[in-house]
From Swiss-Prot:
GO terms for cellular component: Golgi apparatus; peroxisome. This is Uncharacterized protein YGR127W. InterPro entries: TANGO2. Pfam families: TANGO2. GO terms for biological process: Golgi organization; protein secretion. It comes from the Eukaryota.
Length: 312
């Protein structure tokens, strides 16, 4: 179960974004790079690249005009829309690929659908997207809902923080008990991260962000590759970082088509945008990219790190 955490509460940053991609480790992906004529910075899926080798499915990225987007699967209890065929990963790409787009033309479900007629046939999703220059951010989902998010920069204001996972999204006005446990933990931890790093330099903040992304509430024995243990998929609703877990008999993980034996947090992204929205730092840590990597790497010793800095 993926998770996205974001805040505008730090005095030195317009946005701090932390993202874990939970997936089958054997799923073929490309680490973060500039692509589409160096306009989009993101990792991307290798499973569904187009014939033109230009259109990629991606889960999180930003473009050179300050538009950013992160897609997460939406797990519905009744599995009512599991026959939808369009790739979720196209949504970030479609939004990020448009040059000189006015965010106000995209800022709700109906407007987005006007630009992309495949929205209703896309697999169930929660989609965060925005414009760091205009300082406007939204969440839409496959149920047709639109939420204003991150509308405040006050550290004590709930609207300064946002956490999205694979369950139904609830904004700051919703009943806390409705959210998954990992979302509640992440929300409290995100506020603490800001408070503890008010005077920290950027490297310390980056380190704190990855520490939060790596926070696990599961016993360490669960992820021991020598322990042949099938795990209840529901445990992934309770922990921010999901260690490599052997695939259970049923694949009810809110993920894509099963691929390989292990499922878990395979990639972590930290994105920082300066307060004046002119400087971006984007870091991806690839923890694992195959089942064999479980024995070679770990959350504290990732397989690969990609780091980018650029100006808007």
């Amino acid at each position: 179960m993926c998770i996205l955490m974001a805040t505008r509460a730090h005095p030195d940053y317009e946005l701090i974004l932390i993202s874990n991609r939970d997936e089958f480790l054997a799923r073929k992906t490309h680490a973060t790079c500039w692509h589409n004529n160096d306009f989009i910075l993101s990792p991307y899926d290798l499973a569904k690249t187009s014939a033109e080798k230009q259109i990629f499915g991606t889960w999180s990225g930003i473009n050179k005009e300050g538009k950013l987007a992160t897609i997460l699967n939406l797990k519905l209890d009744n599995e009512q829309n599991n026959t939808k065929s369009r790739s979720r990963g196209l949504l970030p790409f479609i939004f990020l690929s448009i040059h000189k787009a006015d965010f106000e033309d995209w800022d709700n479900y109906k407007k987005f659908e006007g630009h992309y007629d495949g929205l209703k046939s896309t697999g169930d999703f929660n989609f965060f997207y925005g414009d760091v220059i205009k300082k406007q951010y939204k969440v839409i989902d496959s149920l047709g809902r639109t939420f204003d998010v991150l509308s405040s920069t006050c550290r004590k204001d709930l609207d300064s923080y946002m956490v999205v996972s694979n369950g139904k999204f609830y904004d700051s006005s919703s009943i806390p008990g409705q959210a998954w446990e990992k979302v509640k933990v992440a929300r409290d931890s995100l506020e603490n991260l800001v408070l503890e790093n008010i005077e920290s330099d950027e490297e310390k903040i980056i380190s704190s962000c990855f520490q939060l992304a790596s926070k696990s509430s599961l016993p360490s024995t669960i992820s021991n590759p020598d322990v042949l243990q099938m795990v209840d998929p529901n445990v992934t609703m309770n922990t921010i970082y999901v260690p490599p877990l052997r695939r259970p008999p049923r694949d009810d993980l809110g993920a894509s088509i099963p691929d390989g034996d292990y499922y878990g947090t395979r990639s972590q992204i930290v994105l920082l945008v300066s307060k004046d929205s002119t400087r971006v730092t984007f870091i991806e840590r690839v923890l694992y990219s195959s089942d064999e990597d479980v024995r070679k790497y770990s959350v504290t010793s990732p397989k690969e790190e990609k780091r980018f800095k650029f100006k808007l």
